Amino acid sequence: MLRRAVELVWLIPILPFIGAFLVGFGLISFNKKVNQLRKPAALLLISSVGISAVLSFMVLADQIGGAPCSEVLFSWASAGTFNLEMGYRVDPIGATMLALVSTVAILVMVYSDGYMSHDKSYVRFFTYLGLFTSSMLALILSPNLLEIYVFWELVGMCSYLLIGFWYEREDAANAAQKAFVVNRVGDFGFLLGILGLFWATNSFDFQIVATKMAASISDGSIPHWAAIALCLLLFMGPMAKSAQFPLHVWLPDAMEGPTPISALIHAATMVAAGVFLVARLEPLYSQVPDVQIIVAVIGTITCFLGASIALIQMDLKKGLAYSTISQLGYMMLAMGCGAPVAGMFHLITHAFFKAMLFLGSGSVIHAMEEVVGHDPTLAQDMRLMGGLRKTMPITGITFFIGCVAISGIPPLAGFWSKDEILSKAFDSYPLLWGVGLFTAGLTAFYMFRLYFLTFEGEFRGNNIALREKLLIAAGKSFDPIETKEIQSTHESGWQMTLPLVILSVPSVLIGFLGSPWNNRFGMLLYPEEALEAAKTFSWGEFLPLAIASVMISTCGIVIATIAYAYHWIDLGQSVASRLKIINNFLVNKWYLDKINEYIFVNGSRGLAKKILNLDETVLDKAVVETGLTTLDAGKWLSYFETGRPQFYALIIFGGVISLIVIFNRL
């Protein structure tokens, strides 16, 4: 059994790839015919991911049962003493991620069957999903930095295709381009870091790189500043992929893609890749504490930034997007505190409840589109929602569970993982713990703000005047003739509600696997550290920090309830009128988009114009003048082409005499 699971692990990424390749090849070769086979194509891809999920859980069961880590390598290229190996590595952290990604992916695919059922590019969407899942699974299994970079780029390519899936929409096309460009910045640094580490260690293997770097740092063969630079270059990749400040700006715009892919990107694939890589590189980063401090500070800034901007969002999906940025900041804070178990545990718990929240938002948007139309300006605006719990009870209940989980209220999953991060931060950097604790209160507030605006109160979708106001504010035209006759929403079909119900189970229960007095998740990943932590566990240390976290989260929920459930205060209007500077700062997203636009976008365009001007005035002119000079020289020389032998003899004689005179002088 153990041997069979390890031997079949290579099939986990291959099966979804084969499915995506077959359907994709069919779309290219027989587009019309394959598009007519919508259900068979989807069934093929769902089945391939389903088999991968079964194999992933077999591998995870092996690791839980004590199976040793295994690595299968083959020589890809060799030259002299250099040998580039590819293959796969199976260990507890990889097995856990395989199970997570495949589980969320298959639930998203089932959900997509309902959500995308009327889309003309249904088959293309499933093809992209299959390729996306395959790329992430292969990334998880990669045994070295070079192989992980290959699949890192494939994940980025798939996210570009899926964010811009509705490329007819200008906003979607621009969002895909923005995601691509921002991630290229991070990936450029990542590639430089990989090459620099190979230069320093002559290896791409994670463990060998860490061991040799430690030896080089200790004997002084690599300066401390160079080690810091290499580690920070490597970190640029995760900064972009996991949306860390200041490379987070692509993630909110990525909401222009279909909602199922938002769930997959935010829960288990693209943004998870960065955190996973930092966990893989923990043996290296632990050798350079200065880098860990930088990672922790960036994570703290990111978690506060995301939470603060989420406070004023009216777009349901963008509110969840900034929530993801904030939670990713918590994960990086854990990594910077030297607590990869805490970071990975929060990655796991967050994946389940954030996938549920995004799929729940998709269910809401799907229902709203039947009332207000398919324009995201209306279908995703919470000012047109309200009271949806009455008509969409399953979506409402599961969304509520997700809000409680992410707010860190016990005994749901988010409490255990977030509390562990805050505990590690308190031990390492008390100031960062304070920011993280305050952010926990903001998280509870904005999540219940989302819930109350969407599911409680009265339905506002039939307010024609409000629709017109929102469209005009967005610079769009309003046509009363196009308003829908349907007056109310309804619950989504079983394909969309079943994944919500399934995801609600781990959102409630999985946190118990990481309880501080019996951390089974930690025992799987780092058994020695988990045993030591269990021995030194103290209720006297745990309870004060846990109570502080729960109290501040409860305060956030209470304030949200007063403002958005009972409407005792108009919090939004009060902040906008009394704290204009702060409100404008948050509305403009810390002005980071404008800064990027001014410095990088306008700067690069200005530089391009100057280069174009230089090309036209100097280079083009030089080329033209060279051509004209050649033509003039040719015309002048043509006068010597007389056809008279005497003239040619005279020229030869003159040339010989000239050479004799020149050489005599030399």
UniProtKB/Swiss-Prot annotation:
The Gene Ontology biological process annotation of the record reads: ATP synthesis coupled electron transport; electron transport coupled proton transport
GO MF terms listed in the record are: NADH dehydrogenase (ubiquinone) activity; quinone binding
The listed locations are: Plastid, Organellar chromatophore thylakoid membrane
Q: What is the reaction catalyzed?
A: a plastoquinone + NADH + (n+1) H(+)(in) = a plastoquinol + NAD(+) + n H(+)(out); a plastoquinone + NADPH + (n+1) H(+)(in) = a plastoquinol + NADP(+) + n H(+)(out)
User: Which InterPro entries does the record associate with it?
Assistant: NADH_UbQ_OxRdtase_chlpt_su5_C, NADHpl_OxRdtase_5_subgr, ND/Mrp_TM, NU5C-like, Proton_antipo_N
Q: Which Gene Ontology cellular-component terms appear in the entry?
A: organellar chromatophore thylakoid membrane; plastid
The broad enzyme category this protein falls into is translocase
Record keyword Plastid present: yes
Q: Where are the transmembrane segments?
A: 8-28, 41-61, 90-110, 121-141, 145-165, 190-210, 220-240, 259-279, 293-313, 328-348, 396-416, 428-448, 497-517, 542-562, 643-663
Which Pfam family name is an example for this entry? Proton_antipo_N
Membrane topology term reads: Multi-pass membrane protein
Sorted UniProt keywords:
Membrane, NAD, NADP, Organellar chromatophore, Plastid, Plastoquinone, Quinone, Thylakoid, Translocase, Transmembrane, Transmembrane helix, Transport
Superkingdom field:
Eukaryota
Q: What is its EC number?
A: 7.1.1.-
Instruction: Supply the NCBIfam families for this chain.
Output: NDH_I_L, PRK06590.1, PRK07376.1
Reported function:
NDH shuttles electrons from NAD(P)H:plastoquinone, via FMN and iron-sulfur (Fe-S) centers, to quinones in the photosynthetic chain and possibly in a chloroplast respiratory chain. The immediate electron acceptor for the enzyme in this species is believed to be plastoquinone. Couples the redox reaction to proton translocation, and thus conserves the redox energy in a proton gradient.
Tell me which family the UniProt entry assigns to this protein.
Answer: Belongs to the complex I subunit 5 family.
Whom does it interact with, and what assembly results?
A: NDH is composed of at least 16 different subunits, 5 of which are encoded in the nucleus.
From the Swiss-Prot or TrEMBL record, give the protein name. Answer: NAD(P)H-quinone oxidoreductase subunit 5, organellar chromatophore 1
Organism in which the protein naturally occurs = Paulinella chromatophora
